């Protein structure tokens, strides 16, 4: 049975800046575009202040600084280096890895038994601990039988209090359905706000609503891409990892400040 994990670095650019400024742990942080024109990244605390992505810096600067916020000009060389370190750790923890973006990667965990949630949770906690200890970046991890469901799991991991930052979904439909009911339609991977508005005319509001719709209706009115999304939400694996590149070739090699030995796989 296919099992995937999505590892998502939390508030990545802001978290990178915090590595070198631990005194800013609970401070609002924003990272600005290359010319300091607009906000391109926010810490959780900055989000709580209502700072929006893409807002012109001159419009929010005064209020942000008044609330004790700290801003940084973007440093993409730094972010790329930190990303490389995270991806190197992940490459040693799975059979295959697909680097999806600078702060996200899918892992192939085909040997994991998802029916035992403790196994998935222990792997996720081990992974989070290694990355936090060796690199200093907090990550969120979703584990599920399809890539689309890992996105759902990652979304739900944000709200976890018992085991913060991790969430797993088994191949049991009742468990899948329970998870999907908590996710707004626009949060489904590949749907977004524009398509969710079009789908709302069909009465769809949540990921669960989309998973329950007639496949033939989706195929005739929309696209094969959305059909795959529906099937994946039901637990049917349609999307595999992109293995066009060897994992080691996906990672831009850079000089490391720390020596990374191959992590053990706790499953």
Regions found by a protein language model. Give the residues of each.
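Short, conserved phosphate-binding/catalytic loop or strand-edge motifs used
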Residues: 102-108, 145-150
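Short acidic, glycine/serine/threonine-rich loops at helix termini
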Residues: 16-18, 41-44, 149-157, 223, ...
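Residues that scaffold, gate, or flank divalent-cation-dependent active/transport sites
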Residues: 1-102, 106, 233
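Long, highly charged, low-complexity intrinsically disordered interaction regions
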Residues: 123-183
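DNA-contacting surface of Y-family translesion DNA polymerases
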Residues: 187, 195-261, 265
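Catalytic palm subdomain of template-directed nucleic-acid polymerases
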Residues: 107-128, 203
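Generic non-transmembrane alpha-helical segments
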Residues: 85, 89-93, 126-135, 198, ...
């Amino acid at each position: 049975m296919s099992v995937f994990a999505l590892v998502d670095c939390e508030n990545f650019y802001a978290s990178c800046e915090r590595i070198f400024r631990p005194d800013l742990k609970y401070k609002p942080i924003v990272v600005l575009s290359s010319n300091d024109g607009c906000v391109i990244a926010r810490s959780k605390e900055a989000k709580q202040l209502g700072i929006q992505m893409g807002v012109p810096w001159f419009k929010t600067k005064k209020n942000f600084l008044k609330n004790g916020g700290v801003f940084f000009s973007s440093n993409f060389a730094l972010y790329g280096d930190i990303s490389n370190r995270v991806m190197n750790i992940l490459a040693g923890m799975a059979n295959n890895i697909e680097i999806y973006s600078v702060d996200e990667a899918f892992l192939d965990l085909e040997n994991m038994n998802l029916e035992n949630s403790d196994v998935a949770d222990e792997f996720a906690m081990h992974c989070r601990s290694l990355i936090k200890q060796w690199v200093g970046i907090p990550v969120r991890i979703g584990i599920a039988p399809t890539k689309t469901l890992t996105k759902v799991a990652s979304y739900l991991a944000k709200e976890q209090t018992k085991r913060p930052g991790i969430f797993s979904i088994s191949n049991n439909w009742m468990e899948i359905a329970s998870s999907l009911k908590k996710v707004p339609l626009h949060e489904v991977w590949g749907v977004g706000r524009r398509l969710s508005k079009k789908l709302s005319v069909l009465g769809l509001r949540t990921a669960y609503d989309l998973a329950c719709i007639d496949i033939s209706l989706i195929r005739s009115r929309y696209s094969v891409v959305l059909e795959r999304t529906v099937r994946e939400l039901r637990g049917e694996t349609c999307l595999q990892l992109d293995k066009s590149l060897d994992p080691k070739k996906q990672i831009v090699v850079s000089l490391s400040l720390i020596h990374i030995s191959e992590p053990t796989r706790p499953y």
